[in-house]
Amino acid sequence: MIPCRAVLTFTRCLIRRKIVTLDSLEDSKLCRCLTTMDLIALGVGSTLGAGVYVLAGEVAKADSGPSIVVSFLIAALASVMAGLCYAEFGARVPKTGSAYLYTYVTVGELWAFITGWNLILSYVIGTSSVARAWSGTFDELLNKQIGQFFKTYFKMNYTGLAEYPDFFAVCLVLLLAGLLSFGVKESAWVNKFFTAINILVLLFVMVAGFVKGNVANWKISEEFLKNISASAREPPSENGTSIYGAGGFMPYGFTGTLAGAATCFYAFVGFDCIATTGEEVRNPQKAIPIGIVTSLLVCFMAYFGVSAALTLMMPYYLLDEKSPLPVAFEYVGWGPAKYVVAAGSLCALSTSLLGSMFPLPRILFAMARDGLLFRFLARVSKRQSPVAATMTAGVISAVMAFLFDLKALVDMMSIGTLMAYSLVAACVLILRYQPGLCYEQPKYTPEKDILESCTNATSKSESQVTMLQGQGFSLRTLFNPSALPTRQSASLVSFLVGFLAFLIAGLSILTTYGVQAIARLEAWSLALLALFLVLCAAVILTIWRQPQNQQKVAFMVPFLPFLPAFSILVNIYLMVQLSADTWVRFSIWMVLGFLIYFAYGIRHSLEGNPRDEEEDEDVCPDNVNAAAEEKSAMQANDHHQRNLSLPFILHEKTSEC
């Protein structure tokens, strides 16, 4: 029988949180050289990929019609909710790691590893698939001569593998890995160059669309669509309308517009790469929130403008789903414009490839530095770039692009991204209701005065909540809480956030797989629906009643807890829509990850071992001993509260390499 002490120790290992210290925030082995404009270009380039040249036509024809502009608006609002949560964490914890780090400092090590492991999968598949798409687009410009050559001499007839090995994609990935290894500043310049060309091409598309467009294409009558369907000998839909809908601005109704918004949501994925630059940007507390919000705004304007121009130039039912813009320009008599579109598409793929490749080594670097992955991945070059993680990421992505058919794996990207979005939103909720405490003491400054001021700063709030610390949960403390957050209220919020995620998952499953029963007004489905809705509302209102921490940072999510809760709802609902095969593949990937974590990561985690940083060797032994004594004293007095809390950054970093 396993002793209870061993079980308790093992459980504590799984939920231990990363302690972020002042000295670790100030110090970084990476080069602080990126500006706010670099972050905006990185976010726009990563998010505004080749999908802008394809997605609008596909969604407009099948789901939304001209109301695709509304679909993009809804999708943008849902994405901004996730973006705001990332922005607050970027302001609070400006360290490399993105959602992995945010989860680590808030809900513990196991969830952090799951998040980081899923992000690795998402970025690897994203990099490999974009590299193959770049290769395929370039091959199209050469009349598919490259593909025909490799199909003739290197054809592969194996299940799960690609039709032929893509040598061009391999060279592309390795070239990009070399560029990123050389330095982040040089990579940023390349990204800004291609992003600028992409934006110029999209501006050309918008202007051309509004010049050659016809508002009548947004007002097509239902009778006209029926005549077209009849002439093409196409059967009508179930409700007697044309297969192209009922015409007008919303030919498929508002449900079609919402369905289009669910697809368009993925068009805004990519801004999270900005959050991985925390140790490479000047003044990250301001630059990261501005970069995330501005890049999402620019991307929305681009998607909105291109989709409006496209549906004005050409009736939505005639749009080509694979190459909508070239066909639309042919339709209005501007055939040569397709070459401009091709150039923009290649530039968009280039920035999207860099946007997928850029955050991958930084996630590997952050996890390796914390001891959860192999330590060699945390090596940094003389140019202050995570060279080992970058080259490892490049080799893995190149092998994937070289051999595998990635179409079946692309949906797995969505799980990792949506799970990260959900966890970051949940972490914001948990974080904002924690008691505010000072940082863990820096190790090598004469800190006694700072420690005393830290104690004085928290003594007032501690004295005000002393009476509540020992009390158990009660209806009075539940609905009439104290004015300041306590450990009790923080624990309550943490439990309620987990319960809310469970309720939202149940609600999403019911509305996805029981929608027919709800439509038939079956009693069991209506009862379950009402139960989920009432409980969700009660949980959110209870969280809203709890006291928030009053300390301020450069950016904070507004409308708590409603905005993060809605973000969790959107993300979990979209996760439920994924196929069973995708979840099976995801489970296999997670089994592999757990093998690595329980065999290596849990034993080598820095949070469970003494910190052996290189710079400690240069510190005076007397200062180290004094700092160690002060740190151990503080841990003895306040260990549990420090683990529950998270530091709040109140200063700016402008250091540069």
From Swiss-Prot:
Compartment(s): Cell membrane
Single Gene Ontology BP annotation: L-arginine transmembrane transport
Membrane association type: Multi-pass membrane protein
Catalytic activity reported: L-arginine(in) = L-arginine(out); L-lysine(in) = L-lysine(out); L-ornithine(in) = L-ornithine(out); L-homoarginine(in) = L-homoarginine(out)
GTP-binding as UniProt keyword: no
Keywords: Amino-acid transport, Cell membrane, Glycoprotein, Membrane, Phosphoprotein, Transmembrane, Transmembrane helix, Transport
Pfam families named in the record: AA_permease_2 (PF13520), AA_permease_C (PF13906)
Sequence intervals crossing the membrane: 39-59, 67-87, 105-125, 164-184, 193-213, 249-269, 290-310, 340-360, 386-406, 410-430, 490-510, 524-544, 555-575, 582-602
Family from the record: Belongs to the amino acid-polyamine-organocation (APC) superfamily. Cationic amino acid transporter (CAT) (TC 2.A.3.3) family.
Function: Functions as a permease involved in the transport of the cationic amino acids (L-arginine, L-lysine, L-ornithine and L-homoarginine). The affinity for its substrates differs between isoforms created by alternative splicing. May play a role in classical or alternative activation of macrophages via its role in arginine transport.
Organism annotation: Rattus norvegicus
Positions of glycan attachment: N157, N227, N239
Protein name listed in UniProt: Cationic amino acid transporter 2
Source superkingdom: Eukaryota
GO cellular component, one term: membrane
Database matches in Gene3D superfamilies: Amino acid/polyamine transporter I
